[in-house]
């Protein structure tokens, strides 16, 4: 289980000002709780690529944003990610939903290529990442922020189960 309120507590610890992205079924509960939050502003975009440009601009303007999207949207965002957050050296953390993860288990009836392409893409693009499978992994968010600041580049934390 991955509880949205515990993720939000980690974001508060990092003093996140904005969460930028596109909601999906896996992050629905997290978005719902963020919309009710009084200090973190949620900014929705129509495409995931816009999230990286907008978050990069917010960072340059002095805000402390986070991108929240799904892996399929991350694929769509590739060039915008490269041209903004990565090339500009923005220490931006993304929480990325891992659609299709369970389809890679032995005996699964079908494999979702969104899952099989995901980690190889992160590796090819030199994006440091970890994966949260449950509440015990939420500390990875803090580590992602430390790593992003250390290398002055984006990092990612993958959200494997749906948030509750």
Residue ranges of model-derived segments:
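Thiamine diphosphate
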Residues: 1-164
